[in-house]
């Protein structure tokens, strides 16, 4: 009898760890928000290279509450990897590197969340940083394939825009972008946690 109870308990726990159809729908809906925010800021980046390079900092802050809500509602591995990969595939027209960085960022995010049992703040922040860093695929061609990218972009972009951008394509600037993503991730995660306590729990959106 004890063995039967143990097996049933283990099966129940395994069932709870598996993504359900409801989990997938929730992840899809909230993932769509992440994709929409990223797409909008990619368009806004056309104003200036400075604005474009700052967009990952801004969208990390805005996505923070969405990320934390998704963690609180599901508390299972899978949704962020799915969201990262789908985002990369949808935005692959911008660069083929998007799905690759999205996949890596999504995997690292899931590992961090699991390590923190979906509750520990430090791991949540680190996981969110990895999630956001996965979106950096739209910038990588500028540094890794600089000459060919600039030659291609020059056919469509304003000469003044191109001159400014070319002057920014140094590795120290890339390091600043990564640092800005880290800072934005911390601020976004903290904002998400604050909203979680203040509004989401009261509204019954999270536990």
Regions found by a protein language model. Give the residues of each.
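Short helix-perturbing small/polar motifs within transmembrane alpha-helices
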Residues: 30, 36, 103-139, 189
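Hydrophobic transmembrane alpha-helices
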Residues: 14-78
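Short, charged juxtamembrane terminal tails flanking transmembrane helices
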Residues: 12-14, 196-207
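Hydrophobic alpha-helical transmembrane segments
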Residues: 24-28, 57-58, 80-85, 99-103, ...
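Membrane-water interface at transmembrane helix exits
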Residues: 37-42, 46, 71, 75, ...
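Short, small-residue-biased leader/transition segments that mark boundaries at the very start
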Residues: 1-5
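Alpha-helical membrane segments and adjacent membrane-interface helices in multi-pass membrane proteins
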Residues: 53-112
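Membrane-embedded alpha-helical hairpins and interfacial helices in multi-pass inner-membrane proteins
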Residues: 124-201
